[in-house]
């Protein structure tokens, strides 16, 4: 085991093999309007 990582694989990596994916937020943050509505509903 050497201390230095083996970068030969990294340098020969083919980016064209990667697939483009659409990222989707799992827990999107609520908008300011939604927060205001929830605050108003909680106080009434």
From Swiss-Prot:
Keywords: Acetylation, Actin-binding, Cytoplasm, Cytoskeleton. One of its GO terms (cellular component) is cytoskeleton. GO terms for molecular function: actin monomer binding. Residues 1-44 are annotated as: Disordered. The keyword Acetylation applies. It is found in: Cytoplasm, Cytoskeleton. GO terms for biological process: actin filament organization; regulation of cell migration. It comes from the Eukaryota. SMART domains: THY. Its main location: cytoplasm. It holds the Pfam family Thymosin. The modification N-acetylserine is found at residue 2. Belongs to the thymosin beta family. Plays an important role in the organization of the cytoskeleton. Binds to and sequesters actin monomers (G actin) and therefore inhibits actin polymerization. This is Thymosin beta-12.
